Amino acid sequence: MAEPQPPSGGLTDEAALSCCSDADPSTKDFLLQQTMLRVKDPKKSLDFYTRVLGMTLIQKCDFPAMKFSLYFLAYEDKNDIPKDKEEKIAWALSRKATLELTHNWGTEDDETQSYHNGNSDPRGFGHIGIAVPDVHSACKRFEELGVKFVKKPDDGKMKGLAFIQDPDGYWIEILNPNKMATLM
């Protein structure tokens, strides 16, 4: 008997599960710690991710010999950030799901510099996702702040979620985890 195909022509649930292995016990303490985006202008990006999305800068690292800086952001209380430099670095790199912004010095002044967001050919990286309590309220605030939208919550076939863009054009999905079951 042929395996039933999902409407998309992709893998069935069973086929997807058959491709997966049980986690090796040695990976028990692994965690997805960060995703990195290259940014042209750290001033614009830091403003966007802190003021618009409410993230906290939890660590900054400069590499003068290689002329770049790293900015780690997360949804953390700034009062919890250790003061000691080494402790702060270890703490920042042990947080779950941080966003690392990488700035190569000088790109902010280069008119021709831009980064590919992965949503046009050649496609690759797609987006990051931010969970919010109320998508419509969050998007109303984003509109008031002049944030660029790719998709508003009531647009398209997938109602109730939105996509906005950061200063470099990276897409950010805005979703409510409790409402996603109706879309999937």
Curated annotation (Swiss-Prot):
Pfam families: Glyoxalase
Disulfide bonds: C19-C20, C61-C139
Posttranslational mods: Glutathionylation at Cys-139 inhibits enzyme activity.
Cofactor(s) named in the record: Zn(2+)
Residues that bear N-acetylalanine: A2
Binding-site positions, substrate: Q34, R38, N104, R123, H127, K157, M158
Positions of post-translational N6-succinyllysine modification: K88, K148
Classification via PROSITE patterns: GLYOXALASE_I_1 (PS00934), GLYOXALASE_I_2 (PS00935), VOC (PS51819)
GO aspect biological process, one term: negative regulation of apoptotic process
Record text on cofactor binding: Binds 1 zinc ion per subunit. In the homodimer, two zinc ions are bound between subunits.
Pathway named in the protein's UniProt entry: Secondary metabolite metabolism; methylglyoxal degradation; (R)-lactate from methylglyoxal: step 1/2
Catalysed reactions listed for this entry: (R)-S-lactoylglutathione = methylglyoxal + glutathione
EC number: 4.4.1.5
Chain positions recorded as Zn(2+) binding sites: Q34, E100, H127, E173
Keyword Acetylation: yes
Gene3D superfamilies noted in UniProt: 2,3-Dihydroxybiphenyl 1,2-Dioxygenase, domain 1
Domain VOC: 31-177
Location of N6-acetyllysine modifications: K148
GO MF annotation, one: zinc ion binding
Phosphothreonine: residues bearing it: T107
Function: Catalyzes the conversion of hemimercaptal, formed from methylglyoxal and glutathione, to S-lactoylglutathione. Involved in the regulation of TNF-induced transcriptional activity of NF-kappa-B. Required for normal osteoclastogenesis.
Family of the protein in this entry: Belongs to the glyoxalase I family.
Quaternary assembly: Homodimer.
Protein name, UniProt field: Lactoylglutathione lyase
Organism of origin: Macaca fascicularis
